[in-house]
Amino acid sequence: MNLFKSITFLLVFVAALLAPWAALVADERPRLAVLTDIGGDPDDQQSLIRLLAYANEFEIEALIASAAGTRGELKEGVIRPELIREIIGAYSQVLPNLMRHAQGWPTADYLLSVVKSGNPHRERAHIGAGHDTEASRFLIERIDCGTHERHLNIAIWGGQTDFAQAMWQVKHERGSEGWAAFVKKFRVYDIDDQDGIANWMRAEFPGMNYLLAKAPPGRDKREGTYRGIYLTGDESLTSREWIEKNIRSTGALGALYPTKTHTAPNKYTCLKEGDTPSWFFFLPIGGNDPNDPSKPGWGGQFQRESDGWWRDLPAKDGLDPRDAVSRWRPDFQNDFAKRMAWCLPDSR
């Protein structure tokens, strides 16, 4: 009995010592907010399914449904937060299996609590007085919770209207000093300036740590760095055959993975995930350094322009900017397959 008591005391003592360390590790996970135009091209569902397979690597603080689709894609302005909730529901079914392989997984209830609705309308005309939304207010709240050392990493998969509304509100309510303090607390990876307001934001909201992943002016839009997630390199890893074998066969979460997207000139028309590089960039195991986007990693490689924003590397001397992502495809696809296998009850 004395031995048992001694062992119990030792275990309690060790646990007490490790508790602050465990909390520190959790606190060091990147803070992430996602704005998605889910409800148009189904590649947003693809990207969200992959993200939830890595949910333990982040502190996911916001999942925002912005105006669905790209400009002109849908006949009316809508938001589709229910599609986010559907995927979270599937995640909840495989969560017990995921927890057998790693720690830090958020509960489904927590993820549902950070799903917020944005503006079904987009562009400059819908930014300003009277245009705040649940999403824009929540973004401000989450940014305010951070520091210049603990940024909120904002991945914009669709339009930037709700983000811009949050910026507008803070700048107009807090003045120059308040804005200067606020702008140090976040950084952005924007996929393609989908609402067409990047130039206006750059002038209106100075000092932002902003990465705009988009093909340079005058180039084919399909040459953007982020499109290396599905273009160039070994495209067989984007095929439906690969997806069926490694993703859709792994339980409730993988079963929701869409198999038809707009991938031209990729012949497989299956995996696109055009938004995934935005959060790959902040993923610790992805190799990128968010403090220095010129360094390579799964989220691409970028250069700083004279205006302070980060942009795609130019295509020159035989360099295809998309290769900055596609070169890692064997690595990130193998890792994705491994994590989705964790969703199975008999996985090892």
Describe each model-derived feature in a short phrase.
Residues 24-348:
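N-terminal acidic, glycine/proline-rich low-complexity segments
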Residues 7-20:
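Bacterial N-terminal signal peptides
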Residues 1-5:
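N-terminal secretory signal peptides that target proteins for export/translocation
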